[in-house]
């Protein structure tokens, strides 16, 4: 049955990671990954944030403005800390900043963050972030992405699969926006609502363990949030599933504007 794609260092003892499904298919998991990519240029990921707690790194997110970060709902944890302006996780830039959540809001309710359904979460920071050489926001989408668009997904997730190798620096990989039926063929029970299907049909490039919550960027705008997919990653005809940010744009802008009554799609 489906398993949540979790960071192996956190839950490998509790979960049968990568276990086969009843029908012989590979396990559907979450907390995604970068396979087949390259080290990101520090100037190209100024909005990328690093989420961690006492157990270590677990997700990425995206800075939207001085006070708000966007990530996946299944990245919700206790005692989240947020590093901004990070490239090499062992090296601290002078302009690096650390914040904690003042408020966490999920689409269903402030206290009910789900794993896959409406996999989106806003984090309000405890104090505003100062923009700098290594820290800048990313724009929300003005329009949904076109089919076939080449977009970049990034994060500190494993760069090998099924073996797990976590890099010190974020990796980026270019993938394509695909038609929803492509993902429905790979995952017959999934809903096609409020998601993007993205990847490379022949395999070899994908997000993977540790990339969840990070951005899928198309033409300089965040169009997707890494949500879930198959493990091992980057397999033939098995793209990844991303939360479709454009469908949540009104909700995001309403929450940021202070409208607690805004309706989630």
Swiss-Prot record:
InterPro entries: Peptidase_S1_PA, Peptidase_S1_PA_chymotrypsin, Peptidase_S1A, Trypsin_dom, TRYPSIN_HIS, TRYPSIN_SER. Residues 1-18 form the signal peptide. Optimum pH is 8.0. Harobin contains three additional Cys residues than other snake venom serine proteases, suggesting an additional disulfide bond. In addition, it is more stable than other snake 6-disulfide-bond serine proteases, since it is less sensitive to DTT. GO terms for cellular component: extracellular region; secretory granule. Expressed by the venom gland. It comes from the Eukaryota. PANTHER family: KALLIKREIN-1 (PTHR24271:SF47), KALLIKREIN-RELATED (PTHR24271). Monomer. This is Serine protease harobin. The lineage of its organism: Eukaryota, Metazoa, Chordata, Craniata, Vertebrata.
């Amino acid at each position: 049955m489906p398993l949540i794609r979790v960071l192996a260092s956190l839950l490998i003892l509790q979960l049968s990671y990568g276990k086969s499904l009843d029908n012989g298919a590979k396990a559907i998991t979450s907390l995604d990954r970068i396979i087949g990519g390259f080290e990101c240029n520090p100037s190209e990921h100024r909005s990328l944030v690093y989420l961690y707690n006492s157990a270590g790194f677990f997700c990425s997110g995206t800075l939207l403005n001085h006070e708000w970060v966007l990530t996946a709902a299944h990245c919700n944890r206790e005692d989240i800390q947020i590093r901004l302006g990070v490239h090499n996780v062992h090296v601290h830039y002078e302009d690096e900043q650390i914040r904690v959540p003042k408020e966490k809001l999920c689409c269903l309710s402030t206290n009910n963050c789900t794993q896959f359904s409406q996999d989106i979460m806003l984090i309000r920071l405890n104090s505003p972030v100062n923009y700098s050489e290594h820290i800048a926001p990313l724009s929300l989408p003005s329009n949904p992405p076109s089919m076939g668009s080449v977009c970049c997904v990034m994060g500190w997730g494993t760069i090998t699969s099924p073996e797990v190798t976590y890099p010190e620096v974020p990796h980026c990989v270019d993938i394509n926006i695909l038609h929803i039926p492509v993902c429905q063929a790979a995952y017959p029970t999934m809903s096609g609502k409020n998601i993007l299907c993205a990847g490379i049909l022949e395999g070899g490039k994908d997000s993977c363990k540790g990339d969840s919550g990070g951005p899928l960027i198309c033409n300089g705008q965040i169009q997707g949030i890494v949500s879930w997919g198959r493990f091992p990653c980057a397999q033939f005809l098995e793209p990844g599933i991303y939360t479709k940010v454009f469908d949540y744009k009104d909700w995001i802008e309403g929450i940021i504007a202070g409208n607690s009554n805004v309706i989630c799609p």
